[in-house]
């Protein structure tokens, strides 16, 4: 059973009474679409380094419905497999309702891929270092059918 914390002399509430810093960075990244994968690990690491925070979490969020942020082993085989997977799992098809109900649209599959993968990842950090595994990299995947500039929000919460 979860019991809400109360003020006063409750030791648990005292432990959580300090304020946590929140830093937000916005990046704009030109992308080509067609399941393009762009490694975001360095920009995220750089944003974290600029805060001086030692422990907390970093959330990387893309402000678009036809792109996703994920963690992968970023190597050419996985990039090719990722594209092949999405092409098989959610193929481009002019019969998607988004395409048939909206004149000129051809990216219904792009929206569905974005929905399934999701717009964000959250990574813990300690001693100012992301706690990623040896082969884990943060990437942006653009599922759209055309080029556009994507906005990525990096929000860092910690102390």
Where are these regions (language model features)?
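Active-site histidine-anchored catalytic micro-motif
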Residues: 2-6, 11-159
